[in-house]
Amino acid sequence: MKYNRFEELPVWQDAIELAVRVFELTTRASFRRYRSVRDQIERAAMSVSNNIAEGFERGTTQETLTFLYIARGSCGETRSILCLSERLPGLTHLRAEISDLKSKSESVSRQLRAWANSLQNTEIRGQRYLTEKSKRLSKQAREREEFLKELEEIRNRKS
């Protein structure tokens, strides 16, 4: 599937949901006494979606990959702070909610890894490298594939 805007990306949407849920957690009165933990986890959670967006907008596959790895690192940082939080004396009553957030973070991380793996194995260099010639060649290749698919369907109907 082709995405034109980062807001359409399922992984970006999940990363936004992760950040919103982290902010909902950190607005609890229990977090007031852990201000530095709160600030750090909020920054880390926001960084995930922001790096996905920045990488998507960069225009080259290599830059996208770089930012996906940064986003994945921020996802790990978020999860690490969640692990710390569930062990802090004033936050143990939030363990179930924190556990759900850790699962969400792991899901986002898996999506980022899968996307990065798919980009590593592609010959596509990114929008920045598209020329009129490369666009025309790409269009011709797609049309050829569609034509061959139609021929195959016709052959199958005759059989």
Predicted regions and their residues:
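Amphipathic alpha-helical assembly/interaction segments
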Residues: M1-S159
